[in-house]
């Protein structure tokens, strides 16, 4: 039996403590008057929005600690996946603290902080596919200029987020006029479609262009399909929230309703993404024993 060096044992034991301390330091370094907000100052949709910002911050932080603690419980080939999972929710927790502060102090559901978060975390979510299934299951299909599967996922995510931001901040109104919000939504959907075409859909309606399903380990098949379900079904919540964004001029603007939809979508998709990947990694690790 292989002997694990004592320093590596120490690192494994200290990782959870370091994770907790890191999250605590981040919280203290961003402390503001938002810490002392009184929930009694809110009612109705405003109260729900305030509540979900708080729950979002705490749940993302808890998920970060969980994924860091579980990283060494899976085989080495799946630890990158666990690292990505931790990064996604850790970065989200940091931004949710800021978004909660902006709402408490200024009454604003911040679009800018939201997209700062998405610009980092959504590409990481898309890259979860190649990190989980491994190089052996990735096809040789390429898109000219863009490249292979990982590049398509990355490009599609950035394209989607970029056009969404343009639509929600009114950047394209001078170019597209009153239809800017709708056109940006449609253009953003192109990036979403790219990821689905590359990674596949959960219903087996089309063969994925970037993944060879026959080469994916049996233990990972359920998790892979669950990730596809999040992409195809779970992400539908985001364009619904976009419709209520005040700057898009699509439906009657309601920043609280938009914020609630986005917060719920983030908690479901970001935490859920990591959980199903962890389940697959644990199952595949057990099969290797």
What are these regions (language model features)?
Residues 12-15, 74-86, 144-150, 224-227, ...:
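Membrane-interfacial loop-to-transmembrane alpha-helix junctions, especially the N-terminal start
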Residues 34-60:
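Hydrophobic transmembrane alpha-helical segments in integral membrane proteins
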Residues 62-67, 128, 163, 190-218, ...:
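Alpha-helical transmembrane segments in multipass membrane proteins, preferentially the mid-helix core
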Residues 144-147, 180-185, 202-233, 255:
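Membrane-helix boundary/juxtamembrane motif in polytopic membrane proteins
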């Amino acid at each position: 039996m292989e002997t694990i060096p004592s320093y590596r044992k120490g690192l494994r034991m200290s990782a959870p403590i370091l994770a907790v301390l890191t999250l605590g330091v981040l919280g203290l370094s961003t402390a503001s008057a938002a810490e002392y907000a009184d929930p009694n100052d809110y009612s109705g949709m405003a109260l729900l929005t305030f509540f979900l910002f708080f729950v979002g911050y705490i749940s993302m932080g808890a998920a970060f600690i969980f994924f860091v603690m579980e990283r060494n419980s899976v085989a080495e080939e799946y630890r990158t996946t666990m690292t990505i999972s931790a990064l996604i929710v850790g970065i989200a927790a940091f931004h949710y603290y800021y978004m909660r502060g902006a709402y408490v102090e200024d009454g604003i559901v911040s679009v800018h902080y939201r997209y700062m978060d998405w610009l980092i975390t959504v590409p990481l979510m898309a890259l979860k596919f190649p990190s989980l299934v491994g190089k052996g299951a990735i096809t040789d299909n390429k898109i000219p200029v863009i490249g292979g599967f990982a590049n398509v996922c990355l490009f599609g995510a950035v394209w989607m987020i970029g056009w969404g931001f343009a639509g929600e901040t009114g950047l394209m109104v001078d170019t597209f006029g009153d239809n800017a919000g709708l056109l940006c939504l449609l253009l953003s959907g192109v990036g979403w479609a790219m990821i689905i075409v590359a990674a596949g859909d959960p219903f087996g309606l089309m063969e994925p262009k970037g993944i060879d399903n026959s080469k994916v380990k049996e233990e990972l098949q359920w998790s892979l399909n669950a990730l596809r379900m999040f992409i195809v079904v779970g992400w539908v919540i985001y364009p619904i929230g976009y419709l209520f964004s005040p700057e898009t001029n699509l439906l009657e603007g309601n920043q609280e309703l938009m914020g609630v939809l986005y917060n719920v979508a983030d908690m479901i998709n970001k935490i859920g993404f990591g959980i199903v990947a962890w389940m697959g990694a644990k199952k595949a690790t057990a099969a290797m024993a």
